[in-house]
């Protein structure tokens, strides 16, 4: 298994990339960032990705996150980026543009991989749910270290409202929720989601957790609850780690070797 890889994290406002040490789950050198042409053509996004990749890394594979469902390297949904991405391959044209092996993965799944193999959920067996709280709500579900990809639990509907409409960053702004009101909604979503999956651990990450480091203390759920450990680097680290895994097969034994 290769010891380093490039992680590329595509967002609505920026594309971030860095070299990742796969034995530690840490960045090597600086994290580069370029503006994201999120609503532009596919070709412009690919060019921006190439601008974000550190120079002198041509021999390293790359993992690329995408804010939507990704199956077999192809995009099937798109959030905060142009809808023209839907139905478009990502891994193949990115590999051609970057001249290297590329693995494409849902952005929340990448953050989950980082937390399970290097962060707050490392070494935890059973069912682990990683929720990314940002503009929307992303999710990654793991069973005994194996990822169940593209769960999109932010679209679960409770009492006529999607989870994202209750407890995302966008919902908090649009509904003018104060902190207590937001905690009430988030607590509701977490407990209803827990009732469906009965996770042993829930990990919360994303921008909202960065703004409120004591968030976990304000929530009450019937399982262990932690904040993510990798914070803003989770997407990059998880994308890079995805290059060590077979396409569509998430093997815990390989993950443990990388996590030593």
Feature locations, PLM:
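General beta-strand structural signal in soluble alpha/beta enzymes
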Residues: 102-107
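Conserved NAD(P)H cofactor-binding loop of Rossmann-fold oxidoreductase domains
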Residues: 67
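ATP-binding/phosphotransfer module of carbohydrate and carboxylate kinases, centering on a glycine-rich
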Residues: 1-61, 70-74, 94-99, 114-130, ...
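A charged helix-plus-loop insertion that forms the helical arch/lid used to bind
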Residues: 75-87
């Amino acid at each position: 298994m290769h010891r380093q890889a490039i992680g590329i994290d595509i967002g609505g406002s920026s594309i971030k990339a860095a070299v990742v040490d796969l034995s530690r789950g840490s960045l090597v050198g600086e994290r580069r960032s370029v503006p994201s042409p999120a609503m532009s053509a596919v070709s412009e996004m690919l060019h921006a990705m190439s601008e974000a990749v550190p120079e002198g890394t041509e021999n390293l594979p790359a993992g690329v996150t995408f804010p939507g469902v990704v199956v077999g390297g192809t995009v099937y949904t798109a959030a905060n980026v142009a809808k023209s991405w839907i139905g478009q391959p990502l891994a193949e044209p990115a590999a051609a543009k970057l001249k290297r092996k590329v693995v494409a993965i849902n952005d929340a799944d990448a953050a989950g991989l980082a937390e399970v193999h290097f962060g707050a959920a490392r070494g935890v067996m059973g069912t682990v749910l990683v929720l990314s709280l940002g503009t929307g709500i992303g999710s990654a579900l793991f069973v005994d270290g194996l990822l169940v990809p593209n769960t999109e639990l932010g679209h679960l509907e409770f009492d006529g409202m999607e989870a994202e409409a209750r407890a995302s960053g966008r919902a908090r702004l649009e509904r003018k929720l104060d902190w207590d009101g937001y905690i009430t909604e988030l607590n509701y979503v977490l407990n209803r989601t827990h009732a469906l999956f009965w996770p042993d651990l829930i990990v919360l990450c994303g921008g909202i957790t960065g703004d409120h480091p004591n968030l976990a203390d304000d929530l009450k759920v019937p399982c262990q609850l932690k904040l993510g450990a990798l914070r803003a680097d989770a997407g990059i680290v998880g994308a890079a780690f995805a290059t060590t895994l077979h396409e569509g097969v998430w093997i815990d034994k390989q993950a443990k070797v990388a996590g030593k």
